[in-house]
Regions:
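C-terminal helical subdomain
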Residues: 139, 240, 248, 255-312
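Rossmann-fold scaffold of SDR-type NAD(P)-dependent oxidoreductases
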Residues: 27, 105-115, 133, 151-159, ...
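Catalytic loop of short-chain dehydrogenase/reductase
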Residues: 114, 118-122, 127, 153-232
Length: 312
């Protein structure tokens, strides 16, 4: 473990006797897991800290922010920001604004997704789903990585489906050891194949979620490979997380058994335990982490039941 010095358990880095307020940002945060992550940060961070709740719908973002700010357990300041993560320029502007105003950010959780359902052709949903989940991940990693303060946390919410074993072995070399530029190229090639109707012949699953999640984890691994040495020296964590099965409208169409599913608040708790830990386990750096444990990058088997839903 690498110990990172915090001030009196408040989740704040301290320099000498001076405590620096922390800046946290969560994307896709007006509902579901993202909202619960903001709630949890607001409750667990200090009164001088700032949590930014972001999303692309101004009205929903403002309403969600008011609800968190008014909650009895909220300790930190909570503000709303409109941010469409599929717009890379908008993400870059947000990062630059926070860098100029606050000297960087301490916690960034990339959580935004677009809902995908089995009752519509996957090709009709591909552009929005890939643009938000993968384009958003790439933009957040590129823009917020450089403004992350020492000891910070740059986290991408992915899934246990994000390990290579969930893909056809023919596709593994496309992601294994890839740079971020290469991951982006693979994602665009896959998107084009989905629209051309050739994706399945190339080995891609029908269900968009699987390649999307693998690409998210590959993107995190690519960025982490470049930063690892410097980040581990100052206690900075770049990682992907799997929150486990969460009972949300996004998950409901794809799974049958929700008997062990978590509420968004329950799922957020484990994610925030990692984010707010005062010690960094180097084994988690650049990896996909579920409930504090690393999921092997080459693990998993291709899911069948979800693709079968798309046969009807």
């Amino acid at each position: 473990m690498l110990n990172f010095r915090w001030s009196h358990g408040s989740g704040l880095p301290s320099v000498g006797d001076v405590t620096t307020p922390r800046i946290a940002l969560v994307t896709g945060a007006n509902q579901g897991l993202g909202f619960a992550l903001v709630e949890g940060l607001g409750a667990r961070m200090g009164p001088d800290d700032l949590v930014l709740l972001t999303g692309r719908n101004a009205g929903r973002v403002a309403d969600a922010t008011l609800r968190v700010a008014a909650a009895a357990g909220t300790r930190s300041r909570v503000e709303d920001r409109v941010l469409d993560v599929s717009d890379a320029d908008a993400v870059a502007r947000m990062a630059a604004e926070l860098d100029e105003r606050y000297g960087g950010v301490d916690i960034v959780i990339s959580n935004a997704v677009a809902r995908v359902t089995p009752d519509r052709p996957q090709s009709e949903q591909a552009d929005e789903a890939i643009g938000v989940a993968n384009g958003g991940t790439h933009a957040v990693l590129r823009s917020f990585g450089p403004v992350l303060r020492p000891g910070g946390r740059l986290i991408v919410v992915a899934s246990s489906l994000g390990t290579l074993g969930h893909l056809d072995p023919r596709l593994h070399p496309l992601f294994d050891g890839a740079t971020l530029d290469e991951v982006e190229q693979v994602v665009e090639s896959w998107r084009a194949a989905v629209h051309a109707g050739t994706a399945e012949a190339q080995g891609w699953p029908r269900w968009l979620n699987v390649p999307s999640k693998v690409a998210q984890v590959a993107a995190v691994r690519a960025v982490a490979a470049e930063r690892r040495a410097a980040d581990l020296c100052d206690g900075t964590l770049v990682a992907a997380v799997c929150p486990g099965l969460v009972d949300t409208p996004t998950s409901r169409p794809w799974f049958d058994d929700f008997s062990r599913a978590q509420t968004p608040s329950e799922a957020a708790g484990a994610v925030l335990d990692l984010v707010l830990s005062d010690a960094l386990d180097p084994a988690t750096y650049g990896e996909l982490v579920r409930f504090g444990r690393v999921l092997p990058w080459h693990g998993g088997t291709p899911p069948r039941s979800q693709d079968e839903l798309l046969n009807h």
